[in-house]
Amino acid sequence: MIIGIWAEDEAGLIGEADKMPWSLPAEQQHFKETTMNQVILMGRKTFEGMNKRVLPGRISIILTRDETYQSDNEKVLIMHSPKEVLDWYHKQNKDLFITGGAEILALFESELELLYRTVVHEKFKGDTYFPSTFDFGRFKLVSEKFHDKDERNSYTFTIKKYEKVKQP
């Protein structure tokens, strides 16, 4: 299954200088539990915004147009087109999580079957927004879980799960 997973603020902001403008340990735990032992796909800028840190327990694919781009980490696969990613994915027995950034989510929109969308109930300053052209009408909201702020999480947020609507 191909799954989108991301967090955004109330205005759809997903990043500031290729990083997330908030830190929410409970949301990070949700991401970890949801993607563990699966494949995550992100763009080069998102990967570099994480200081090229590889998330343990997952296969990481970095999508870049730069044909010369390399990673020092053997657990990172570098690919150069959506077709290359999909050809590789169809030979696997794992889910593929599209984690961002905005360009990568937009590239794979038509392939997405399930969405995990975290909405942080605040407005931040940043430079990258979730694609405004994304068609949520193709999906049905199936669950929401609200998280209140606490000593570890400075903001309230809601994790929303959507399933692709089956066409008759």
UniProtKB/Swiss-Prot annotation:
GO biological processes: dihydrofolate metabolic process; folic acid metabolic process; one-carbon metabolic process; tetrahydrofolate biosynthetic process
Highest taxon above the source species: Bacteria
S-S bonds: none
Catalysis: reaction(s): (6S)-5,6,7,8-tetrahydrofolate + NADP(+) = 7,8-dihydrofolate + NADPH + H(+)
CDD domains: DHFR (cd00209)
Binding site for substrate: 5-7, 27, 58, 118
Residue ranges of domain DHFR in the record: 1-164
Signal peptide: none
GO cellular component: cytosol
EC numbers for this chain: 1.5.1.3
PROSITE patterns membership: DHFR_1, DHFR_2
Protein name: Dihydrofolate reductase
UniProt source species: Lactococcus lactis subsp. lactis (strain IL1403) (Streptococcus lactis)
Name of the encoding gene: folA
